[in-house]
Amino acid sequence: MNIRLILAAAAATMLAGCSSLKDGEYNLSLVTTGDGHGSWFYKPFSENGSARSSLLAQSQYVNELRAEKGADNVILVDAGDNFLGSNATFYYDYADTLSPYLYPRLASYMKYDAVAAGHCDFEAGHGVYDRAAETFRKEGIPFLAGNVVRTDNGKRYFQTGTIVKKNGVKVAILGYTNADNAALMDKSAYSGLE
């Protein structure tokens, strides 16, 4: 899973990037989410749907943490797998294929610092993850998958990482997806990529 890489990179870079700061103690909170699979809302879309963990609940937690610690002391990243798994994702994957993708707009509302692409985010194909990547770009959120490379020119398809500045501390956030994506899904979903 991407989470280990994100955490290790963030921790290592926080330490390395402190040289220009004044001596003192700096406390940053790193909040990671992932494997949401479309659980954006509190209940599924049915009369008998029961309450569940959701992006809404995560938003409440993050807002409380920011209020307690200070917004500039909280880093919020997601490890991917958000584009499949619910009626809401199905709607944006296959029914409304022209609107900006919803998850990046929700991530913008929550003020994510970066989002990595999970392997499930590729399964619905280019139409979904390319549209989501464009929506992330418009929302100003880095969408990361540094190990996804174009087969036609060998260039990276997505950003590898980003640097955020929190309370004067520069923190690098790196994002990688499952290296076996091409073997895990239909070839058309991952066409032109390796």
Language-model features, listed with the residues they occupy:
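Acidic, metal/ion-coordinating pockets
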Residues: 19-194
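Gram-negative bacterial Sec-dependent N-terminal signal peptides
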Residues: 2-19
